[in-house]
Amino acid sequence: MSGTSQVLQNDSHQSQHASMAYNQRQPMMYPPPPQQQPLHSQNSLPPLPPIPAPSLPPISNNISNGNTNELNNNNQQQQQHGQPPLPPPPINANQQYYAVPPLRAPPPLNTLSSVVNSLPTLTPTLTNATHSTMSSNSSAESSASSSSNSITKPKSKRSSKGRVFQCTGYPGCNMSFTRSEHLARHKRKHTGERPFTCPYCSKNFSRLDNLRQHKQTVHAYETYLTKDNRDSKLLIERSKSKKKLKQQEKKAQQQAQLQAQAQAQAQAQVHMQQHQQNGYNFQPPYPQFHNQYYANNQYQGPQPPPPPAPQQQVPGQQQPQPQQGMPAGYLDPYRQYPPNTTFDPMALPPPPKINAHPQKPLPPLPHQMGGGQEQPSDNVSQQGLKIPDHAFTPKRRPEPLALQHSTHSNENISNEGNINANTNTNMNTVTSSITSDAVYPPPPRSATSAASLTPNLASPLSPLFHQSFSQTTLKSTPDPRGSTITNSSISIKSPMSQHFSILSGNSNYSNNTTNSLPSVSNLPHPNWGSTNGTTGSNGTSGGSYQQNSFHQRQSSVVSDFSIFSNSDNRKDIKSNWLKGVLNDDNNNNNNNNNEQQQQQLQDPKLASPAPTLPPVSSITGGGTSNGNDSMMVDNMENKNDVSQSNVIIDSNNNNGDKMVNKLNFQSIELHDNNNNNTPSIKSTHSTETIQTTMVVVNKSDPPPLSTPTTNTNTNTNSTATTNATGYVSKKPTINNLISQ
């Protein structure tokens, strides 16, 4: 034993020296683990080889487990057989990563023995880890299977627990219920029974909850009204009675159809037998047609059976037969028989009788014999469309109201047409594309110039606008600076009524109390004040005024049109007013015509002598201040009085027609100063009635020479006297009434 121990000690010393030398050669390498030391067990077994486990790469647990098992087996064999230990394996450079940290001193033998004894315990830990993973997987699978089993098991328990009532008698249905009511409700699905009926619409339901839901949703209003049980019971009874009636009607219809079909077949057979006995080859179309007829008309009501006894039929009763839709050509072979023969169903067929009415060769239906002859026609009429008794009268849009001026009357319009027809023959007309008959005056360029004078605000382009102003165009030729005459029912508050003169000649021809509104043609040129002032101050003639007005009409857009006292010039303007707007070359011709007519007015030789009018004093009973035959106006009271209702015009123009009218509705004073050419206007209003004195010139006569006598003063007011041909109204003026 001592020898063996010495050998072991020597070996251990050698191994220590070798390890130290190896460590000196490779300082980076660590010494081998302490497991390389010889094991001093109680039996003095040879030392164990070094454990290669830490030097191997971690490839897999199985390989390490196999190596450890082999090492353990080798150690056991060495311990049993006493073989010498194997030399330690050489350490390669690849094993640097797996080197164990160096130990300063070799461990004692006790620790080595404890480590060797602990080695077998390392391998089970690895195997336990692998087994634990495997066991975890298997446990998961087992838990899943157990959970699936636990899910299926409660179902089976639920289905079996307390579900005594099973649905039997219907293959493929394994339903079971806990209550018999549920089973009965389920069986209604198989049987299709619907015992619950809606009392309002007679709809059937298999479940009571469905009926309640139907009532609450569809018949919510009815259920709210019929909360009382009595009402609901009445409704239910009514619905039941309705159902019974419907069922009875259906049954009756079906029975009637069956009876009619049977009767038709029997009668068809009788007819066929009769034809065969008499030698007629009458084949199936007749019975087949009736079978189809009744099959297609099953919805018709019950029809009375034909009487068994034969009866005669009048030929006139066959008139509704063409409505049956039967073919009309299959009875042609029977037309050779004599007419007016009676029909006997047991003796002869009906075709000879049909010859009386060749246009309606259809035979009677079999059920029409006897009392049932007129019923099919009624049924056929019910099948067609029903024609309404009353004729369809669509609603018509009301016609637009004939807008007529407020001051017009039918008499004035009719008289106006006659007057226009008479005056148009005496005028030299100029054709125009717009106004061919030249009845209406030309409309102004702007509607604002005359819109304030029309209460209804008619459009200047509408014929109503022309009708309202066309009466005075052919009756009077006023001067643009005449006085204003208005209607008593209309108050003119526009600025035009204060500046310009408007004349209405209705009162001269008829004693109408309602005078029509003035004509558009009487409206003066808007710029007449400035031209009047310039011509008055310069002392020029009336021709220059008219030429200036034409020039303004061509150049100015605001100006309306110029007005002349002669009817020929007025006619030219009416026909060519649009050309004047478009700056046509015809305006030069108009200027030449105007110059010629002004020369006629200025030259007394070219014009016919104007007859004189009786003085106003002889008409009204008053006196005049002058002894001339012209109409004079007393102006002694008007020199210093501004509020008195007179119209006083100061002018230096010696040519042109002058008319003086007296107003108390609007009194206007126009003062003409030499320094300022624009007239000053002062107006006052009063509530007295209108009294007018008017002079109208006949347009049928040639243009007269008007020689007015004018008293002009530079600082005081003066009045104009006018000589003209025509009629003078006999209404007294206000001044004459005051003077009396």
Curated annotation (Swiss-Prot):
BP terms from Gene Ontology: biological process involved in interaction with host; cell-abiotic substrate adhesion; filamentous growth; negative regulation of filamentous growth of a population of unicellular organisms in response to pH; positive regulation of cell adhesion involved in single-species biofilm formation; positive regulation of cell-substrate adhesion; positive regulation of filamentous growth of a population of unicellular organisms in response to biotic stimulus; positive regulation of transcription by RNA polymerase II
Hydrolase keyword on record: no
PTM annotation, UniProt: Phosphorylated at Thr-191 and Ser-556 by CBK1. Phosphorylation by CBK1 is required for ALS1 and ALS3 expression, adherence, and biofilm formation.
Zinc finger (C2H2-type): 165-190, 196-219
Pfam families, A to Z: zf-C2H2 (PF00096)
Skewed-composition ranges (Low complexity): 58-83, 126-150, 291-301, 311-328, 409-436, 529-538, 583-603, 707-725
Cellular component terms per the entry's GO annotation: chromatin; nucleus
Disruption phenotype: Produces poor biofilms and decreases infection on rat denture models. Increases phagocytosis of the fungus by host cells in presence of estrogen. Decreases expression of GPD2.
Stretch list, region Disordered: 1-105, 126-164, 269-385, 404-454, 472-491, 513-552, 579-644, 698-726
Organism superkingdom: Eukaryota
Positions with biased composition (Polar residues): 1-18, 374-384
Modified residues (Phosphothreonine): 191
Keywords: Metal-binding, Nucleus, Phosphoprotein, Repeat, Transcription, Transcription regulation, Zinc, Zinc-finger
Swiss-Prot/TrEMBL induction comment: Expression is under the positive control of the hyphal regulator TEC1 and repressed by TUP1. Also induced by acetic acid-stress in a MNL1-dependent manner.
GO MF entries: DNA-binding transcription activator activity; DNA-binding transcription factor activity; DNA-binding transcription factor activity, RNA polymerase II-specific; RNA polymerase II cis-regulatory region sequence-specific DNA binding; sequence-specific DNA binding; zinc ion binding
Cell compartments where the protein resides: Nucleus
Biased composition (Pro residues): 46-57
InterPro entries: VerF-like, Znf_C2H2_sf, Znf_C2H2_type
Residue numbers bearing the Phosphoserine modification: 556
Known function: Transcription factor which acts as a master regulator of biofilm formation. Biofilms play an important role in pathogenesis and produce many infections such as oropharyngeal candidiasis or vulvovaginal candidiasis. Controls the expression of genes that govern cell-surface properties such as ALS1, ALS3, HWP1 and HYR1. Down-stream component of the hyphal regulatory network that couples expression of cell-surface genes to hyphal differentiation.
Assembly and binders: Interacts with CBK1.
Misc note: Implanted medical devices, such as venous catheters, are a serious risk factor for C.albicans infection since they are substrates for the formation of biofilms, which in turn serve as reservoirs of cells to continually seed an infection.
Protein name: Biofilm and cell wall regulator 1
